[in-house]
Amino acid sequence: MTLTIPNAPGSSGYLDMFPERRMSYFGNSYILGLTVTAGIGGLLFGYDTGVISGALLYIKDDFEVVKQSSFLQETIVSMALVGAMIGAAAGGWINDYYGRKKATLFADVVFAAGAIVMAAAPDPYVLISGRLLVGLGVGVASVTAPVYIAEASPSEVRGGLVSTNVLMITGGQFLSYLVNSAFTQVPGTWRWMLGVSGVPAVIQFILMLFMPESPRWLFMKNRKAEAIQVLARTYDISRLEDEIDHLSAAEEEEKQRKRTVGYLDVFRSKELRLAFLAGAGLQAFQQFTGINTVMYYSPTIVQMAGFHSNQLALFLSLIVAAMNAAGTVVGIYFIDHCGRKKLALSSLFGVIISLLILSVSFFKQSETSSDGGLYGWLAVLGLALYIVFFAPGMGPVPWTVNSEIYPQQYRGICGGMSATVNWISNLIVAQTFLTIAEAAGTGMTFLILAGIAVLAVIFVIVFVPETQGLTFSEVEQIWKERAYGNISGWGSSSDSNNMEGLLEQGSQS
């Protein structure tokens, strides 16, 4: 059976022909369970992002050397990002060689070890080493979870299910603020805040023991019987046969490519360069528009706005985190109904407005030199609006797009590389925010972020295609057409023998 791309399982043409085979978000309990289990990796990511913002307030109280050094504060925050950067870079290879399941189990072990080290840290420097371990686990998980969910999901609901991972990230941030608030009056405040983070890692490790490997990874590793058993838990018999035929066609195409894939290969093919530019660019702009500045330092920002109480700062930050989680729920719906590109653009326009409000409020606050007051509350409003606009769009879109724009053979490596770009960008922002705010002023810092958001709008318009509802094969065709023009016949499995020639053509571009 030969499948052309318009009739591939899950494509719009296929689902128009067989509407009874269309699946819904809640149509398969197995897929939901897999999504939530894999998404705990996102919860670890989110919890670590949020918990350090509150813990830092109390770490400064326990260690005078930390209180006296903005650089040391930034290092405690950003060392997890250094670990995540390394973990994400290695995570692509771990995913492709050992599989998505083993990569997740490895991430859980490393994260739990880091949580124990942080909770027991006798000084800031041991604490920093624990942050590095936690970051390694988060980095591997950030690569693995979106790809694992995407490869197990029907294409018609893939965007929403991958976005569930982002919901878990924002849910983890909200949970961290709840935990922060719960331990404010408990001896050893920050140790409890940081130590509790190991619990979700242990839970995910146990649950993942009962989860299968990605069916697409199994199929490409020639473990077809196992892959079919996994697919049978998702699809009924009629669509199952079509999905198997589609994977067989994809496998034949993969055989025409080089069996050993290296990082430099990504830059030798024009179509892969274009895909990586779009994916990595989205990841970079997600960070440089300031989201983790807000999440890492929101209690500190609230205190900068004139609200000096630790408890009040944490409470207002808890509201911001709750809005972030709620906004992500909205994004899960819209990402498969409005599309990735429109959602990202509307999100960025709102982010620009919010950052301008934050900038104006801090400029005025510095002129009046009063605590709290009108401009303090205006800053809190700006934070809230920022989250309202960012969470549904630029929160889930970069991770969703990166889980679906790369060919199977390159998905692990490209996903790892783009996630590394995210973590490097995250590190730069986290390590410099307080320093820039001290040197240039908080108002100017947010104005710079607004300017970067304007550049992000231009980037999305020019470089990011719409991938809503497309199969992996259809997405690949977009990059081939952008790289080489609209070549007649692309998309038929009978043309797979031409792949090697085109990749060689791309390497000379």
Swiss-Prot record:
GO terms for biological process: myo-inositol transport. One of its GO terms (molecular function) is myo-inositol:proton symporter activity. Coiled coil: none annotated. The keyword Transport applies. Expressed in seedlings, leaves, flowers and pollen grains. Not detected in seeds. SUPFAM superfamilies: MFS general substrate transporter (SSF103473). Disruption phenotype: Reduced root length at low concentrations of myo-inositol. The chain crosses the membrane at residues 39-59, 74-94, 109-129, 132-152, 159-179, 192-212, 274-294, 315-335, 343-363, 374-394, 423-443, 444-464. It comes from the Eukaryota. Keywords: Membrane, Symport, Transmembrane, Transmembrane helix, Transport, Vacuole. CDD domains: MFS_HMIT_like. It is a multi-pass membrane protein. One of its GO terms (cellular component) is plant-type vacuole. A motif (Di-Leu) lies at residues 502-503. It is found in: Vacuole membrane. Belongs to the major facilitator superfamily. Sugar transporter (TC 2.A.1.1) family. Vacuolar inositol-proton symporter involved in the release of myo-inositol from vacuoles. Not involved in glucose or fructose transport. The sorting of INT1 to the tonoplast is independent of the AP-3 adapter complex but is brefeldin A sensitive. The C-terminal domain (465-509) is necessary and sufficient for vacuole membrane targeting. The di-Leu motif is required for this sorting. This is Inositol transporter 1. It comes from Arabidopsis thaliana.
